[in-house]
Swiss-Prot record:
Keywords: Disulfide bond, Glycoprotein, Secreted, Signal, Storage protein. GO terms for molecular function: nutrient reservoir activity. Glycans are attached at residues 73, 212, 360. Arylphorin is a larval storage protein (LSP) which may serve as a storage protein used primarily as a source of aromatic amino acids for protein synthesis during metamorphosis. It is a constituent of the sclerotizing system of the cuticle, and serves as a carrier for ecdysteroid hormone. This is Arylphorin. Glycosylation at Asn-360 is required for proper folding.
Amino acid sequence: MKIVLVLAGLIALVQSSVVHPPPHVLKTKDVDTVFVERQKKVLSLFQDVDQLNTNDEYYKIGKDYDIEANIDNYTNKKAVEDFLKMYRCGFLPKYNEFSVFHDKLRDEAIALFHLFYYAKDFDTFYKSAAFARVHLNQGQFLYAYYIAIIQRKDTYGIVLPAPYEIYPELFVNIDTTYKMFRTKMQNGLINPEAAVEYGIVKEDNHYVYYSNYSNAITYYNEEQRLAYFTEDIGLNAYYFFFHIHLPFWWTAEKYGNLKERRGEMYHYFYDQLLTRYYFERLTNGLGTIPEFSWYSPVKTGHYPLLTSYYTPFSQRPNFYNVHSEENYEKIRFLDAYENYFVQALQKGVFEGFGQTIYLNDSKANSFVGNYWQDNADLYGEEVTKDYQRSYEIVARQVLGAAPKPFDKYTFMPSALDFYQTSLRDPTFYQLYNRIIGYFNQFKQYLEPHSQEKLHFVGVKVNNVVVDKLVTFFEYYDFDATNTVFLTEEELKTKYPHNLKVRQPRLNHQPFNINIDIKADVATDAVVKIFMGPKYNENGFPITLENDWMKFFEMDWFTHKITPGQNTIVRNSNEFVIFKEDSLPSTELYKLLEKGKVPFDMSEDFGYLPKRLMLPRGTKGGFPFQFVVFVYPFESTTKNLTPYEKFMIDNKPLGYPFDRPVDTSCFKQPNIFFRDVSVYHEGEYHAYEYNVPAYFSHTNKVPKE
C-alpha cells in the first residue's frame, strides 16, 4: 500500500504540481512536399546513431554507394579524391571517440565535410551521408553531417535535432545512463519501490528518469552551486551550435560571407557568454571569474561523472599542477603566444602571418579575434599547416588533464574535448576569461565613443518601466532513447521513443519593458536593451569606466519614431537572440505530416535558450540594472545571411559597450538606466528537487 501511495504522489506531482510559465503558441512555418521529404531523410540518419538499421532506406543506399563511380556528381573533384585517398588509408574506426580537438581526427572530419559540401545536389548529398553513416565512425559522421546541413544551400532551413537527443550520454551523468540501461536490460521495472526511490517512474508508454545535476563529487569546490546553469542541456547545445555555425577550421571566404567580421563575432560570443555566466556567479555569491597561471596549480578541479559507451572522462583534482614535465613544451608555447600579442600591443602594430595590423584601429577587432581563435582566416591558404598551432586547443589539452593519447585514434577524453561538455568544466570559463582579458587590453587602445557619436538629435528616452522579474525552477523532459541499444526486432518495428530524462531547469515569467520616447523628428531608430550588475561582488556600485565589459546585450530592434510621444512595449518573448526549447523528433514528425516545421528550430536554432534569459534571482530580489539605448538606424549594405539578425547595421557588435567608456559621454537623453531586481520563487536550489525527496517539494509559483 505504501508503494502505491508514494508512486501515486510522485506521478501526481510531476503531472500537476510542477509550475510552468504561461503556455506559448508554437511558431511554425509552412513547407512544401519537397522540403518534407528532405527533412525526413535528414532526420533518419540521426536516429539510433550508434547502430545500423539494415531495414532502413539509408542502409540500403549507403552500403553499396560508390563514391568514385559518381565523382562527376561533385563540384570539387579534388576534394573527393582527397577524401578517397584518406579513406583507403584508414579512417577513425567505428565506436572510437571523436573530438575535433585532435588533429588527425579533425583532418578526416574536414575531408568528410568536403565530400558532403561539394555534392552537386541533395540526392548526391544524401547518398554520400548514407555511405558515411554505414561505413564511418558515428561521431565523425555526425560532426561533418551537422555542419554540412547548415552550410549547404539546398538544406537551408532544415530542422536539426537537439544534440542532447542524439548524444544523451554527453548531457546527463552516468548514474542516469546506468538507470536507463538497467531498465532496458530488465525489460522494465522489477521493483517499483526501489524505482521510485531512485527517481524512475513509468508514465503512459514511457519511462521517466530523474537526473541530478552534479554535486560536490564532481565539483569539490564552490562551483557546484552553478551546476544548474553550466550543465543546462540548452546552454550546452547552444555552444555546440555556435561551433558548427563557425568552425575554427572553416574559411569564411570559401564557405560564407563573414570574413570581415568573423573575429569580431568570435569575441562577441565569448564576451556575452562569460557575462551571462558572471551574472549567475553574482547571484550565487561567487563574484568574479577566478584567474589562473600557467606556472601555478589550477585551484578548480573537476570530476565529470560522464562516460561515453567506451571511455570514461578524465578527472582533474583541485590544485592541479599544470606546470608538469609533460606540459613544459605546451606551456612554453602558450606563454609565448600570449607574450607575442602583448608585445604587439605595446608597439601598437602586429606583424605576422603576412599581415601588418595597426592595433589602435577598431577594424583590428576582427584580426584580434582570428588571432585568439587561431582560425583558418588568420592564415592564407598558401601557409603550410606546419606553421599553425592553436592556442585554444593546446590550452584545452593542458587544462583537461587527460593522459597522453595512446595512439592517433585512442584517447581518454576530458570535458574540454567536446563542445557538448566544455561548459561543465569551470576552467573553461577561466580560460576564455583570460582570452577576453587580452581583448580588453587591446580595446584600451581604442578611442571611446564621443558624445557626438552617441547623441541622437531630437530624441529623448523619458522613462523605462520594467515588470517584476521572477525566476523559478521547473521540470523539463527530453527524449533520451538514443542512450540505449535496441534489438533488431525493435529497430525493425520502429521501437517507440520511450525513455525520457527529467531535470529541474531554470526559467522565468515573461515580462514587458515599456519605453517612453519623446521625439522632435520622424526617424528610423535602433533600440537596444542591456542588462548589467548594479553592485559588484563586494557590494560596491559598479562604474562604467571599470565595468563596461559586464553588460549583457538582451535585445535589439528597429523602430519608426514619429514626432511627439512614442510608447514602445517590448515583451521578453520578442527578444531577438533567444529561442524556445527544441521539440523532440517525435513531435517534428507530427508537424511534418501537416506540412510545417518549428520556426525557431529552422531559423534560430543557434540562439540562447529563452529560459536562461535572466539569472536566478533571490527571495528578496537581486539588484541589476537595464540600459536602454536609442540611436539612428543606418542599414548595412552587405549581405550577411544568416547573420543579419546579429548585424542589423555597421556598428560594432555590443555597441556602445564594445570598448572602454567615458562616463560623461553616456549622460545622454537617448540613454536611460533603470534599476531592477530579480526575484526567485519556489525552491531556491535545484537539488531541492532531488531524489527521493523530489516528490514532496513545495513549489507554489502561480501561473500568470
